[in-house]
Every structure is written in structure tokens, then in C-alpha cells.
Amino acid sequence: MDSPLPRVSIAVPSGDMVHADFALAYAQLCMASSKLQLQLITVKSSIVAQARNNGVDLARNFGADFILFLDSDMVFPPTILFRLLLHRQDIVGATYAKRVPPFEILGTPLAEQPTVPSGDLVEMQRIPTGCLLISMGVFDKLSKPYFRFDTDAEGAIIGEDYVFCDRAREAGFRIWCDAAMSREIGHIGQNIYRLPDAGWYGTARRGQSQ
């Protein structure tokens, strides 16, 4: 007999609004995942760590097997949830670039990768949570709050996603990144466009005088 399909909570930390491109990608994901028992969670908070913790609590009340965190400034393929589930890992996701130059890739791969490759999976020391699937059993091994900010030895702030990764690895969990999927998702940003110089004004004036 086939095992039942997992129950999945999709948690989206956000403010009062989300990007239109994200909303479209989210709708397409839900359509592609309609055979699953889904719970859609919008956790509004100006404190992202609190939003993630609230999402975990709501997922637990739903009886979810997994929680998928999606940030509201991401775009992704419709099949992303099924593809992450097929990896059968406790913590697996995709990474992406920062939205400001020099557009560094977020997360830290382990220096020593497994001797037996796992397809497109790369084992990570840390991974961002903008597109991350987590087994609910992970939270049974962690004390609350599951997500929180911290500081390093030099006083720099460590984000709630990296602190979670550190604690999960200390609890014995491995963290994986789907390298192929990471090339398919996008981090929505914003640019300001300006005229290159003021010369166009003089050119326009001369054109009017002719």
C-alpha cells in the first residue's frame, strides 16, 4: 500500500503586502500541489524570527509533516514543493543571491562534501530560509524559540535563518541545498533608473530652436 501523501504547511512571513510576481508563483505552486493536504499560512510580523516561530506553531496545530518557508520576495517553479519532498531530507531548500552588489550567494557549503554525491544536493553549514522545507520532527529536537537572532564574537548580528541552521546541526541534522533548483528561483529586488547625464536637456533645447 502506498504511504499517504504528507501534510504540508506553507508559511509566508510578510508585512501587509507581497510582491505580485511572488503571488503569481505562489498560486501556480498551489495548483501544482493540489493533491497534497496543504495549509497556507501568512504570518504577518515586522520581526521575521517571530513570524517564523508563529508559522511553526500553526503548522504543528495543523498536524503538518513538513513546513515550507517561502519569503514573499521570491519567485520559484510550480513544482518546487514536490521536488523538495522527493529528496526525503529533514532540511532541504534552495539558495539565492543577495539583492545588492556584489550579489553574493547566500549560505555556506560544507568544506568537505559527502563522498557519495546525492544528485544535485550540496550539504550546507548554513542556508537561507527564503525557500526551505523542514520536517516538523526537527522542531521536536530544538528548544523554543526555534528562530532567533544572535551575535558573533565581534558583535555582528547573525540572522535567524543561520542561527536555526547552527542549532539544527548541533542537534544532529544535516542541511541540504538543491543546486539545480537554486538556478531556477529568483530573489525579487528593486532598481532606481536615472538619466546618465544632463546633456540630453541641452540637446532637446537645441532641437526646439531649430
Task: Locate predicted features.
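Residue-level recognition of beta-strand->loop/alpha-helix junctions
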Residues: 41-44, 95, 179
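Short beta-strand-to-loop acidic/aromatic patch adjacent to the donor-nucleotide binding site
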Residues: 64-75
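N-proximal low-complexity "stem/linker" segments adjacent to membrane-targeting elements
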Residues: 1-46, 50
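C-terminal catalytic/acceptor-binding lobe
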Residues: 3-9, 141-210
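Conserved catalytic core of nucleotide-sugar-dependent glycosyltransferases
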Residues: 56, 77-151
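Active-site nucleotide-sugar/metal-binding loop of Leloir-type enzymes
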Residues: 53-66
